[in-house]
Amino acid sequence: MVKIISDSTCDLSQELLRKYEIDILPLHILLGDKEYEDGKNITPDQIYAWSDANKTTPKTSAPALADAMELFRPYAEAGREIVCFSISAGMSTSGNVMRLAAEELGASDRIKVIDSANLSTGIGLLVVEAAIMAKNNRTASQIVSEIEKLKPNVRASFVVDTLTYLYRGGRCNAVAAMAGGVLKLHPRIVVEDGAMNASKKYRGKIASVVMNYVKDMEKDLKKARPERVFITHSGCEQETVEKVRAYLKELDIFDEILETRAGGVVSSHCGPGTLSILYIAK
């Protein structure tokens, strides 16, 4: 059976990783001179505390080549095919590290690397689809072919509570960040062609903003594939998350409504209170 591996930015829960037998290759997070592995020895809340204390965003970096080789080696030596997923190439060199690891192991013919052109559970949606195909005994080439067809149909967007973290990370300018704070503006960010672009702006308290964001998606949600939808957040009030879940359930579109918490890398750039709705369009 083909082994499915993703970098840590897919933001899948431990439960889903176990269910679909997915392995994770962590990106690295630098808090000053201390280096951590995303999802292993650092939490988003620790990152927020450090970022607020230091008034800067942590640096993040691609997985270490040695770690990628160590993760791939037992499967390669057993002759198994591997399909790997990386965050958008425009955001990290994670995919390049995976390809280099495959070359170093002399297994480039059996290890396929997919640039998700996405982030968070926008990647996770594709990873789960690949894992289901693997369980159905599809080959690596077949999985890659099907996933490449699905990639343009992934819909990933999120609404942020504060522009501070995007500003610290160079994703928006100081004027926009200041105006956002004063006017209580919350932009909707959409992932398109592997990059993040701002679209609609909402005003008000984040709890009502989140619901308006979700309700604005209703027309598009009705064109979604029914298998699953992700609610991924970086530390929202649980009451808000439950209201979103109830709304999606009432639409009666999806077989599964899956809640996940954004990992360290994604959280370090978007900040607390961010909520995303992610699905695959028909």
What are these regions (language model features)?
Residues 3, 9-23, 28, 34, ...:
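Mixed-charge interfacial surface used for oligomerization/domain docking
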Residues 35-106:
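Class I S-adenosyl-L-methionine
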